[in-house]
Swiss-Prot record:
Top-rank taxon: Archaea
Transmembrane segments: none
Pfam families: DUF134
Protein name: UPF0251 protein MA_4245
Secretion signal, residue range per the UniProt entry: none
InterPro entries (alphabetical): UPF0251, WH-like_DNA-bd_sf
HAMAP family in the record: UPF0251 (MF_00674)
Cystine pairings recorded for this chain: none
Similarity section: Belongs to the UPF0251 family.
Length: 112
């Protein structure tokens, strides 16, 4: 099934980028694992709601997108993390389309 193309995603404001970008099951070489890719803005959605305890509406405002777009990012992030944890896959955090909150530089990665 072909994915529908709609409006391009607008950049999200991200306050924290991760220092550590890989997580994997212990005792299994990375070369033997399937990898799930989580974008920086998906990680930010998880951080704002699940760690900082913000409501989705407040988190969406902080990131600079609609509540619906934020919900899609959060849903995607939770699904990817759940799949990786339940199926023993590695998680790589990379890419996306975001702006660092304290700068106006856009980091756009076409791979996502």
């Amino acid at each position: 099934m072909k994915k529908c193309r709609g409006r391009p995603k607008c950049p999200r404001r991200v306050e924290q980028t991760p220092d550590i970008t890989y997580f994997k099951p212990r005792g299994v070489p990375l070369s033997d694992l399937e990898v799930v890719s989580l974008t920086v803005e998906e990680l930010e959605a998880l951080r704002l709601v699940d760690i900082e305890g913000l409501r989705q509406e407040d988190a969406a405002s902080r990131v600079g997108i609609s509540r619906r777009a934020f919900w899609e990012d959060l849903k995607s992030a939770r699904m990817k993390v759940a799949i990786a944890l339940s199926k023993g896959k590695a998680i790589e955090i990379k890419g996306g389309n975001y702006i660092r909150a304290e700068s106006s530089d856009i980091n756009e990665d076409a791979d996502t």
